[in-house]
């Protein structure tokens, strides 16, 4: 009698939810019992815990990761007439934040080894209008922050971390979120530290910046009905803060499991048609995404899907070829490395609670592919 094939979803929250069921239900009950839903003790407790975790003085909760970046830019006074350097290979929210602040994005190519921005290309993109560098820690690995910070210091620029995919990642022993002037995090449910809905935060050591960000996210108010900025409504609600506080003590263990899965992938996948990702020296990769490259990407995806293995693409169309950014005037071929990644990248299953059989099924299917 033949064995039932092992199916592997691209992602599943079920193992984590089962393990933390009592904690999450307790968090919900606690918020309901308190009958306080915005700006209360749960928010304050999580902000302190996450600031301590990242090794910074301040964490300011907000509505989502995009808002976190927008609030940082606005609090820094970056807006119309200014330019912000950002990687060409990233999720569109990175660049949308720059646009929402009124500034202009300047896209710089990544390295194929790291998928992160190439510091060797940043200097040439700096102009008199440049005000900041947006350093994205893509897929869970920190950008080369020493080089980025050195360039920023030489030109008087701010450094903003987009840490939406890098909860718990480290660079030379320091946590993502503590490596620039400020960092934006997303707590979208699929993140390594995810809420049960949308949520985000900003981390920083800058006292004045944190105060401005908190006011900007609360209608520009420093105290009730007193508005010193033209702000917006972007706050971390009590329920999501309570859920995040329940999950945070488990983040390192969950990241360690992702690293264990990634280690097996890296050690046991040996298909010459598939280029595996790398953990760079000085970095602790938390493997939010396990991104491989394959010239026959679509065929590989079809092969894996036919075997019950879920996949995704991060990201199938680069920023400069999206209709939303036609204004940049960058045609196909303008940013060849971002285009190569978008045409060849495939994301393999990676989530807390994958069974050994599921991990083995992914490895076997990749190795069996004839590209």
Mark where each language-model region is:
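Phosphate-binding glycine-rich loop
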Residues: 35-83, 96-101, 107-109, 174
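Glycine-rich phosphate-binding segment of PLP-dependent enzymes
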Residues: 3-6, 15-37
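PLP-dependent aminotransferase class I/II
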Residues: 3, 14, 26, 41-48, ...
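Conserved active-site segment immediately N-terminal to the catalytic lysine
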Residues: 161-196, 224-228
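Short beta-strand-to-turn element immediately C-terminal to the catalytic PLP-Schiff-base lysine
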Residues: 185-186, 200-205, 245
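PLP-dependent aminotransferase-like
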Residues: 74-163, 170
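Hydrophobic/aromatic ligand-binding patch that stacks against planar heteroaromatic rings
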Residues: 96-98, 151, 175, 192, ...
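Structural detector of well-ordered beta-strand residues that form the stable sheet scaffold
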Residues: 60, 85, 106, 159-160, ...
């Amino acid at each position: 009698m033949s064995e039932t094939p092992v199916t592997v979803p691209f992602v599943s929250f079920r193992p984590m939810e089962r393990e933390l069921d009592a904690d999450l239900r307790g968090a919900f009950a606690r918020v309901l019992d308190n009958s306080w839903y915005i700006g209360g003790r749960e928010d304050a407790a999580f902000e302190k815990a996450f600031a301590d975790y990242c090794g910074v003085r301040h964490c300011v909760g907000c509505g989502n990761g995009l808002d976190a970046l927008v609030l940082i830019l606005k609090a820094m006074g970056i807006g119309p007439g200014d330019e912000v350097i950002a990687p060409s290979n990233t999720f569109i929210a990175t660049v949308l934040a720059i646009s929402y602040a009124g500034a202009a994005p300047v896209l710089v190519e990544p390295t194929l080894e790291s998928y992160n921005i190439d510091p060797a290309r940043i200097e040439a993109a700096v102009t008199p209008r440049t005000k900041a560098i947006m350093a994205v820690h893509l897929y869970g690995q920190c950008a080369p922050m020493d080089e980025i910070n050195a360039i920023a210091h030489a030109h008087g620029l701010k450094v903003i971390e987009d840490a939406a995919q890098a909860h718990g990642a480290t660079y030379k022993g320091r946590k993502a979120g503590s490596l620039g002037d400020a960092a934006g995090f997303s707590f979208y449910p699929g993140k390594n530290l995810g809420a049960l809905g949308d949520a985000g935060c900003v981390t920083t050591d800058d006292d004045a910046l944190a105060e401005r960000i908190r006011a900007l996210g609360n209608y520009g108010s420093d105290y009730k009905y007193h508005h010193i900025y033209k702000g917006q409504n972007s706050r971390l609600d009590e329920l999501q803060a309570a859920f995040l506080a329940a999950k945070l003590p488990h983040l390192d263990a969950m990241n360690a499991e992702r690293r264990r899965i990634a280690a097996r992938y890296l050690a046991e996948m040996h298909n010459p048609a598939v280029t595996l990702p790398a953990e760079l020296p000085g970095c602790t990769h938390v493997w939010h995404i396990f991104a491989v490259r394959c010239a026959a990407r679509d065929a590989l995806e079809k092969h894996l899907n036919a075997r019950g293995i879920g996949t995704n693409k991060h990201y199938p169309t680069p920023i400069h070829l999206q209709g939303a950014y036609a204004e940049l005037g960058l045609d196909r071929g303008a940013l060849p490395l971002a285009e190569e990644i978008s045409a060849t990248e495939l994301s393999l299953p990676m989530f807390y609670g994958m069974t050994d059989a599921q991990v083995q099924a992914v490895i076997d299917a990749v190795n069996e592919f004839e590209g």
